């Protein structure tokens, strides 16, 4: 099907605008590409710049701690916890930062979160516990 150029251009502009605003509430803290290389100092700089540590990303309902648990390093997780990130906050489907660390992280990240109050027995809406996700991820 043919879409005329003015409509196509308008659609592209709208999609780009939506994509660039997806993580605006929590700044770079919810950007998984940035998160992969972010240091503890980078996290502190974002927080100092006004990024909301408890903001939910519009795509998936994840917080900065969810992103750090998935893509970040243990030092950035500790920086977020020290700044007051809530460990028990879940996504719309009940996944906590501990679930993300279990499914996609490392054993070091997984061990950091229970000591900060993460509940290893918390269940997602699909009834998954973080221990089950850790065992099935093969990363441990």
Label each PLM-derived region with a short phrase.
Residues 34-39, 67-73, 100-106, 133-139:
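Ankyrin repeat A-helix N-terminal signature
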Residues 57-58, 91, 124:
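Ankyrin repeat boundary/linker residues
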């Amino acid at each position: 099907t043919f879409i005329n150029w003015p409509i196509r251009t308008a659609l592209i502009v709208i999609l780009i605008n939506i994509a660039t605003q997806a993580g605006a509430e929590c700044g770079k803290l919810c950007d998984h590409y940035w998160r992969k290389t972010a240091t503890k100092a980078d996290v502190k700089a974002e927080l100092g710049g006004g990024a909301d540590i408890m903001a939910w990303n519009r795509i998936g309902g994840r917080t900065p701690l969810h992103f750090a648990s998935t893509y970040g390093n243990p030092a950035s997780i500790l920086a977020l916890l020290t700044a007051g990130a809530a460990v028990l906050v879940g996504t719309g489907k009940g996944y906590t930062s501990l679930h993300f660390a279990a499914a996609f992280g490392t054993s070091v990240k997984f061990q950091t979160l229970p000591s900060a109050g993460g509940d290893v027995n918390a269940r997602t809406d699909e009834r998954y516990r973080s221990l089950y996700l850790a065992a099935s991820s093969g990363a441990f």
